[in-house]
Amino acid sequence: MSRCAQAAEVAATVPGAGVGNVGLRPPMVPRQASFFPPPVPNPFVQQTQIGSARRVQIVLLGIILLPIRVLLVALILLLAWPFAAISTVCCPEKLTHPITGWRRKITQTALKFLGRAMFFSMGFIVAVKGKIASPLEAPVFVAAPHSTFFDGIACVVAGLPSMVSRNENAQVPLIGRLLRAVQPVLVSRVDPDSRKNTINEIIKRTTSGGEWPQILVFPEGTCTNRSCLITFKPGAFIPGVPVQPVLLRYPNKLDTVTWTWQGYTFIQLCMLTFCQLFTKVEVEFMPVQVPNDEEKNDPVLFANKVRNLMAEALGIPVTDHTYEDCRLMISAGQLTLPMEAGLVEFTKISRKLKLDWDGVRKHLDEYASIASSSKGGRIGIEEFAKYLKLPVSDVLRQLFALFDRNHDGSIDFREYVIGLAVLCNPSNTEEIIQVAFKLFDVDEDGYITEEEFSTILQASLGVPDLDVSGLFKEIAQGDSISYEEFKSFALKHPEYAKIFTTYLDLQTCHVFSLPKEVQTTPSTASNKVSPEKHEESTSDKKDD
């Protein structure tokens, strides 16, 4: 009898190894209940429904209000420019020193008045709640949720504190001069040291004892639809100084202000807002939050505490989405997937699975190659089997079910990334690859023939007529598979890790099902693996 036939016979003696008796198969280790889906699946989309009656109202009001408001805004900007010029004349380009004396007093007073006048001319009715803290009480304002470019109204209400802005914005004619008048912290996208310099500048200003203006930061770093608070970036919390949370609400029947990655454009929102009779906005200044010693040393802890307080006051949940999710959304769209397919809650994924953005982006390319043929950008069991070049079998369904965390019959990108990291990568170690190769190499000649490859997979998957020629040719450079080819393929395709280790589980189950005296008998086959040694290596559990 050939070694391949012997291997198949051994697998066949395992309880439940036969087709149709999968209930007795050694079950794949169940995953831990973790990585719960976020309470808000996509905070970066806004779909405002405008009825026919409302459309007629917008058109009628727009005929009168739109040109008037555009002219008023332009006039106010022109009036503000001379004050901004007086404030910034002879100031160094990098704003190394604060604007002081009469220039600061006159220009701040004039610009605050003109700022309020501009938002009033746009139709905004502003309600202010709470007490604004002094620079000594709270050097930093943190405003959320950040949902629109109109959120600049918080800066006007707070007394024109400094803001963090891109360096390119300061070069825009007219607008750039007005921006420089509030002494912003400028961030450069081309300077590799920009992040470090920005943090150092924030620390310098917030610890100046009131010499510099207060700083207003939108810690979310991007706009959302106000349905939740996403991850707060730690920049505003690194100095370890007291901060004052600022809540922003837009309690209007028709939302014409929300500016997200999927929704109305800048021009469309301006036109819709200007065509409203009025737009309500509430700016609430919460009590100052003073960090304790632990929070001073851990800005992420301080940021999370402040975020939770703000979310509780707003009555909305928090999620671990961040700006990197927006970048993944754009990448998903470029790969012809639905944009929302790229959402993974990047903060949680990167922290728990130790993945950086480049790693997740690489997985998105892999995911797109599988899901591009399906509707909705999700992987079904058929696409899963086609990608693995294997038929739909009971073992494959078990593996698919482990990826499918919410049991909806499909795998989304978030589930795919978690599955690779938690289920496949722990089983894809050098040791496991070596053991798997030895099991496939039945005659122990250092190479796997197509007959050996087919026999072991047929036995482990319980599919006696399995055709693996396509998969074999993808791995092998010639008529057989060397260890280097096997290892290279396993590392590039961690999805196969569970398939390759299924046969190990079968052998383990077989050994433990034998009488004790047989279990203790030394095996003469050099390519058998010890159950005790393998017990840990096949686990797909991972602490969260």
Swiss-Prot record:
InterPro entries: EF-hand-dom_pair, EF_Hand_1_Ca_BS, EF_hand_dom, LPCAT1-like, Plipid/glycerol_acylTrfase. Residues 1-57 are cytoplasmic. Residues 79-544 are lumenal. Coiled coil: none annotated. Residues 391-426, 428-463 form the EF-hand domain. It catalyses: a 1-acyl-sn-glycero-3-phosphocholine + an acyl-CoA = a 1,2-diacyl-sn-glycero-3-phosphocholine + CoA; a 1-O-alkyl-sn-glycero-3-phosphocholine + acetyl-CoA = a 1-O-alkyl-2-acetyl-sn-glycero-3-phosphocholine + CoA; a 1-acyl-sn-glycero-3-phosphate + an acyl-CoA = a 1,2-diacyl-sn-glycero-3-phosphate + CoA; a 1-O-(1Z-alkenyl)-sn-glycero-3-phosphocholine + an acyl-CoA = a 1-O-(1Z-alkenyl)-2-acyl-sn-glycero-3-phosphocholine + CoA. Pathway: Lipid metabolism; phospholipid metabolism. GO terms for biological process: membrane organization; phosphatidylcholine acyl-chain remodeling; platelet activating factor biosynthetic process. Belongs to the 1-acyl-sn-glycerol-3-phosphate acyltransferase family. This is Lysophosphatidylcholine acyltransferase 2. It comes from Homo sapiens (Human).
